[in-house]
Amino acid sequence: MDRYDFSLKLERAFVEYVDRHADEKGFGKGEFAHLVWPEDSPKAASSRWSAMRSKATNTGKPQGLLISDAHRMAAVLGVNLGYILIVLEDRAEMSK
């Protein structure tokens, strides 16, 4: 697996991790999105989070994840971003 593919795999693993942990903490999809992007309207924040979790109809790919968004998501969950990335990177390495 080349570095680009690995990076995309890590990004997708991060989104899945955050989605799962937000559900486990009892956040609704819209509620979580609004906590991550409080400057956006609730509808815009929900659309943004949905675009990261699912494939777009025009490209067939989910929206990419900015490091700033990843940091915000980790903060809402109360988990250190570096910790999440290390755990997910180790898991991805083992599944190569």
What do these predicted regions represent?
Residues 28, 39-42, 80:
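Short coil/loop linkers at secondary-structure junctions
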Residues 1-36:
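A short, Lys/Arg-rich alpha-helix, primarily the initiator
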Residues 35-39, 90:
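Sequence/structural signature of long amphipathic alpha-helices
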